[in-house]
Amino acid sequence: MKQYIEIIDVVARQILDSRCFPTVEVEVYLEDGTVGRAAVPSGASTGIYEAVELRDGDKDKYLGKGVEKAVANVNDTIAEEIIGLNVLDQAYIDKTLIELDGTNNKGKLGANAILGVSLAVAQAAANYLGMPLYQYIGGVNAKVLPVPMMNIINGGSHADNSVDIQEFMIMPVGFDCFERAVRACAEVYHALKKTLNSKGYSTGVGDEGGFAPNLKSNAEAIEVILEAIEKAGYEPGKEFFIAIDAASSEYYKDGKYVLEHEGKTLTAAEMVDFFEDWVNKYPIISIEDGMAEEDWEGWKLMTERLGKKVQLVGDDLFVTNTERLKTGIEKGIANSILIKLNQIGTLTETLNAIEMANRAGYTAVVSHRSGETEDTTIADLVVAVNAGQIKTGAPARSERVAKYNQLIRINEELGEVAEYRGRNAFFNLSK
């Protein structure tokens, strides 16, 4: 097998994501006929420091959300630069893409154009070598199946209801294998549907497959989930814990946190009190974006108060960016980073962020976006880096289920080598 295999063509197209908006799909062709394909996701609640997702802005097409400019950038500018390069040199190709763009936020070519190429290159290389993507990226030590962080009640910008908090999730930490954990999550999901029906609530779903009922309060979301866990025959606080994504940048206004549906306007300290009260009352193991992306002082306070007993995940805070993560580590802020490929724009930069987090004792949670496709790259990525946690929606809607099904296949392929760490995935929390 050759150690230098040339890229001979790169083709991008506009396809649809799960929210019926266009996104970029890229195919990379190699000299021996091998092809790699990848599709790029898109977020609903986006951090202001994320790499730029290039949209056309033509209101006559797809409400201005078209990606024909990004597609043209791949088919013309990027293709010209990377045709002839060695597909097996991912780091060099990603460096070439970054330099070709020349901006610090990928605003010229678009992170959606660059990421599509970066991921398609990796897939083409794995296909050429005849190995699974997780093994190509992670090598022989890639063997940890993740604890799912399943979003089963949607609120905030992921739903049209009376809940301020964006996501309420279940984490099956009390099981000894991935497949058993997924089964338990599916059973809780069905139990939750019955529970909501019995209370007269809607069981329509949000962007990520979770239910979006018009609950009376944010706390009621947790309470109906705990009821569903018990109805499914499991024990909250033992087999299942709760994770929330507060997405608090969405309701941070003029230095205050405005919980519209609660009728409350809170200071940073009061917001920390709010979460601390929940942590003391409910089996919560993870809080994502509990403070706004600009509220470093609030984050510091929250970390001091809750950082030993709860995973505090920075999403909008860190945006998968090593510079922002480095600042957070130096200031002792948060203890975990959410990893979203399209926030930074290349596979290499994503791997660098995960490595930096691990060195600092932070956990890394590999994540989907609300606008997804059938692409399963993140399922392979989470195993490749042994991250131990994945956030990819409810066990419903095929663009979410595709990731879980890929993980089931990987689990089967790894066989006895596969590890499922459960509660031990939270290695930096006190037991």
Curated annotation (Swiss-Prot):
Binding site for (2R)-2-phosphoglycerate: 166, 340, 369-370, 391
EC number(s) on file: 4.2.1.11
Residues binding Mg(2+): 245, 288, 315
Pathway this chain belongs to: Carbohydrate degradation; glycolysis; pyruvate from D-glyceraldehyde 3-phosphate: step 4/5
InterPro entries documented for this protein: Enolase (IPR000941), Enolase-like_C_sf (IPR036849), Enolase-like_N (IPR029017), Enolase_C (IPR020810), Enolase_CS (IPR020809), Enolase_N (IPR020811)
Catalytic activity, as annotated: (2R)-2-phosphoglycerate = phosphoenolpyruvate + H2O
Listed Pfam families: Enolase_C (PF00113), Enolase_N (PF03952)
GO MF annotations in UniProt: magnesium ion binding; phosphopyruvate hydratase activity
Gene3D superfamilies in alphabetical order: Enolase-like C-terminal domain (3.20.20.120), Enolase-like, N-terminal domain (3.30.390.10)
Keywords per UniProt: Cytoplasm, Glycolysis, Lyase, Magnesium, Metal-binding, Secreted
Subcellular locations according to the entry: Cytoplasm; Secreted; Cell surface
EC class of the enzyme, as a word: lyase
Matching PROSITE patterns: ENOLASE
Gene Ontology CC terms, in alphabetical order: cell surface; extracellular region; phosphopyruvate hydratase complex
UniProt cofactor note: Binds a second Mg(2+) ion via substrate during catalysis.
Active-site feature positions: 208, 340
Cofactor requirements of the protein: Mg(2+)
Gene Ontology biological process terms from the UniProt entry: glycolytic process
PANTHER family, alphabetized: ENOLASE (PTHR11902:SF1)
Function of the molecule: Catalyzes the reversible conversion of 2-phosphoglycerate (2-PG) into phosphoenolpyruvate (PEP). It is essential for the degradation of carbohydrates via glycolysis.
UniProt record similarity statement: Belongs to the enolase family.
UniProt-recorded name of the protein: Enolase
Organism of derivation: Clostridium perfringens (strain 13 / Type A)
